[in-house]
A protein has these predicted regions:
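Membrane-interface helix-loop junction between the first two transmembrane segments
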Residues: 109, 128-139, 161
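PEST-like, low-complexity acidic/proline-rich intrinsically disordered segments
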Residues: 1-13
Length: 481
C-alpha cells in the first residue's frame, strides 16, 4: 500500500512516554529507548492488558518503519527532527488500512447511523414549530411543558438506539432494517408533535410503543442468536428487553386510559425509561462503551442541532432588522459552537473507559438546551413578544448549556484535569455574574445581547487559557497555532 505524507502536516497527539509537546518525559526507564529520536513505548506491565499490548506492539512496529524511512531519506536523524517524526508516525498510524491493524481498529460511525440521525433533526424542527404561532406574546407554560416533553421523548429514542448500536450494532441486514423501521415510525411521532398533540394521542403513542417494541426485539435477537457475548452482555441485553417491554406496556395502557378519562400517563413511561437505564449503570460500567464511536455520534448530532440554530437566527437578517443584533446573534452561535468543538477536539479523552451513560445523559440535556436557545433566539427576533421573559429564557438555557460543558470535564484527558477546579470556578463565576447582569439589564435588548456575547467569548477564552496553561504551549488542533 502506497503511503502519502504531507511534510507540513502537524497534529497534536498524546502518546505513552511522550509529553504533549513532543518531548520525551524525564522519568522514563525503558531500555528500548536508545536515542532521543526514538519513540518506542512499553509493551508489558501491570497496567497493560492483552489488547493494549497488541496496540503498543503495532505502534512500535510503525515507529521502526517510519524512523528507517526518515533515515534513508536524509541519511540520518538528528534530535531536531524528533517532533516532525512524531507527527509522521502518528499520521501513519491513523491512515493505515483496516486490514493492517485488524483487531485494534476503532469502530467507525456507519453511514446508516448518520442517515438515521437526520430524522431527529426533522423531529426537533417540528417540535420547534410549536412556537411559530407566538408573534405577539410569550409562549404559555403549557406550550413550554409540551416542548420539553416531546423533546425528551425523541432524545430518549435516540439515546437508547445509540447505546445499543454502540455495543452491539454490526453491518447486518437486521440492524439496518431495525433502524429504517424506527425512522419510519418517527415520522408518525413528528407529525403529531404540535400544539394539538393530544388530538393525535393514539397515532403518536402507537408509534412510540412500536419503537420500544422494536428496540426490545433487537436486544432479544442479539441475546438469542449472537455467539460473541458473555455473561455481562447477557445481563445488559436481558435488562434491555425487560425495560423496553415495560415502557412499551405503559405507553399502550396510557392510550385507553386517555381515551376514557383524559388522563395522560405517558410521562410515566418516559420517566421509567430514563430511570431504568440509569439503574443498569453497574452492568454498563463492567462492559465499557466504544467511546470514540460514542463521542463521534454525539458530536454529529450536536453539529446538526447547531445547524438548526443557524436556521433559527435567519429572521435577524430580514430587511429592516437591526444589523448590530444580527451580527451579535451570529457571533453568539459561533462562540457556543467553538466552545463545544474545541472541548471535543482537544480536551475530551476519546479513549476513555466508561459506561457512556453519563456522557449520553449530558448530551441529551445539552441538545435540549441548544434547541431551547434556538427558540429563544427566534423569539428575540420578534419585536412584539415581551422582551424580559424571552431574554431570561435565553440566559437560563445558556446557563444549562455551559453547565453541561462543565460536566464533560470528567471525560477530559488526565493531564488536562489538573486545572479542573479553576475551570469550574471561572465558568461558574462567569455564569452567576451573567445571570445577575441579565436580571438587571434584560429589559434592554442591545445591552442584554452584548452581555451574552461577552459571556460566550469569555468562557471560550477561559477554556483556551486553561488548555494553554496545561500544555505550556498554544497548539490547539487548528483553532490557534
Amino acid at each position: 500500500m502506497a503511503d502519502h505524507y504531507d511534510e507540513n502536516y502537524e497534529e497534536v497527539v498524546s502518546l505513552p512516554g511522550v509529553d504533549t509537546d513532543g518531548e520525551r518525559t524525564e522519568n522514563i526507564d525503558d531500555g528500548r529507548i536508545r536515542r532521543p529520536a526514538e519513540f518506542f513505548v512499553r509493551t508489558t506491565g501491570d497496567d497493560i492488558d492483552e489488547q493494549e499490548h497488541a496496540r503498543r506492539e503495532y505502534f512500535n512496529k510503525v515507529v521502526g518503519e517510519a524512523e528507517n524511512e526518515a533515515i534513508q531519506e536524509k541519511g540520518g536523524l538528528d534530535v531536531g527532527a524528533e517532533s516532525s517524526l512524531l507527527y509522521r508516525i502518528w499520521s501513519r498510524v491513523n491512515h493505515e488500512s483496516e486490514e493492517a491493524v485488524a483487531g485494534i481498529v476503532e469502530k467507525k460511525v456507519e453511514y446508516v447511523e448518520l442517515f438515521f440521525d437526520l430524522i431527529f433533526v426533522y423531529s426537533l424542527r417540528t417540535i420547534n414549530a410549536l412556537f411559530h404561532a407566538y408573534e405577539h406574546s410569550f409562549p404559555p407554560m403549557s406550550a413550554i411543558q409540551t416542548f420539553l416533553f416531546l423533546t425528551a421523548v425523541v432524545m430518549q429514542v435516540w439515546m437508547f438506539t445509540t447505546m445499543f448500536f454502540n455495543r452491539y450494532g454490526r453491518k447486518a441486514l437486521r440492524d439496518y432494517i431495525s433502524i429504517f423501521i424506527n425512522m419510519y415510525l418517527l415520522y408518525y411521532m413528528a407529525s403529531g408533535s404540535n400544539h394539538h398533540w393530544l388530538d393525535h394521542y393514539i397515532r403518536y403513542h402507537g408509534a412510540w410503543a412500536l419503537i420500544m417494541l422494536n428496540l426490545a426485539y433487537r436486544s432479544w435477537d442479539k441475546l438469542r442468536f449472537s455467539t460473541h457475548i458473555d455473561d455481562i452482555d447477557r445481563k445488559i441485553l436481558g435488562a434491555n428487553v425487560m425495560h423496553h417491554l415495560i415502557e412499551c406496556g405503559i405507553i399502550l395502557v396510557s392510550i385507553p386510559v386517555h381515551e376514557t378519562t383524559g388522563l395522560v400517563l405517558s410521562p410515566l413511561a418516559l420517566i421509567y425509561g430514563y430511570a431504568a437505564k440509569a439503574a443498569e449503570h453497574r452492568a454498563y460500567k463492567a462492559r465499557p462503551c466504544d467511546f470514540p464511536h460514542l463521542a463521534e455520534r454525539n458530536l454529529l448530532l450536536v453539529i446538526l442541532t447547531f445547524g438548526e440554530m443557524i436556521i433559527g437566527i435567519a429572521s435577524f437578517f430580514e430587511t429592516g432588522k437591526n444589523v448590530l443584533l444580527n451580527i451579535i446573534s451570529f457571533l453568539i452561535v459561533i462562540g457556543m459552537f467553538l466552545s463545544y468543538g474545541f472541548f471535543n477536539d482537544n480536551v475530551l479523552d476519546h479513549h476513555k473507559k466508561t459506561s457512556g451513560l453519563g456522557f449520553l445523559a449530558i448530551h441529551v440535556i445539552m441538545i435540549l438546551a441548544i434547541n431551547s436557545t434556538t427558540i429563544a433566539l427566534e423569539l428575540l427576533a420578534r419585536p412584539l413578544v415581551p422582551l424580559f421573559p424571552k431574554t431570561m429564557w435565553m440566559a437560563a438555557m445558556l446557563f444549562v448549556y455551559y453547565i453541561c460543558l462543565l460536566g464533560f470535564e470528567r471525560y477530559a484527558k488526565e493531564h488536562l484535569r489538573a486545572n479542573r477546579f479553576r475551570f469550574f470556578g471561572y465558568i461558574l463565576s462567569a455564569l452567576i455574574i451573567y445571570f445577575g447582569l441579565m436580571l438587571l439589564a434584560g429589559h434592554n435588548q442591545t445591552v442584554g445581547a452584548l452581555i451574552t456575547l461577552a459571556l460566550v467569548y469569555s468562557i471560550f477564552g477561559v477554556i483556551l487559557h486553561l488548555h494553554h496553561s496545561s500544555l505550556r504551549k498554544m497548539k490547539v488542533g487548528g483553532y490557534i497555532s
